[in-house]
Amino acid sequence: MDDSVILVKTKEEAKAFLNACQGATFTIEDITTRPVKKTPPAPFTTSTLQQEAARKLGYTVAQTMMIAQRLYESGFITYMRTDSVNLSEYATASSKDAIIHMMGERYVHPRHFETKTKGAQEAHEAIRPTYMENQSIDGTAQEKKLYDLIWKRTIASQMADAELEKTTATISI
């Protein structure tokens, strides 16, 4: 018997594994489910904005910075060249108001993030919407998508931990 372990992290990986197992004989030895919490990510720095825009929107670094520059020049976001993950008191308070309005008090958890990078350029605060009340903007499709990414990340950074369940199944084949 092979005691190899297969770690399945996504729904897609689980479906692929189940498809590969079709027709096989197996026994479910054990199933355990336990609660887990996930802390929201910090607000965007230049680097994390570029990474997330590439991952979620397919934008290159140059595209991201060009679009962010337009958003900044239009007054929609704070300065986009920063290593800081800090938010102003205004941003924290208005994020709290938005979360309460959309989801209720229990989802609010104001946080203060610390920049861990040695020698970080923190003259500016984290990249965030200039006015948190503006959930969307007028602009090109690309500008709207990048703004939405920034707005959601800023709001998420001030929310309570996500409460999830982790399920582990032991299957012998």
Model-inferred region functions:
Residues 1-173:
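Core catalytic DNA strand-manipulation module of type IA topoisomerases
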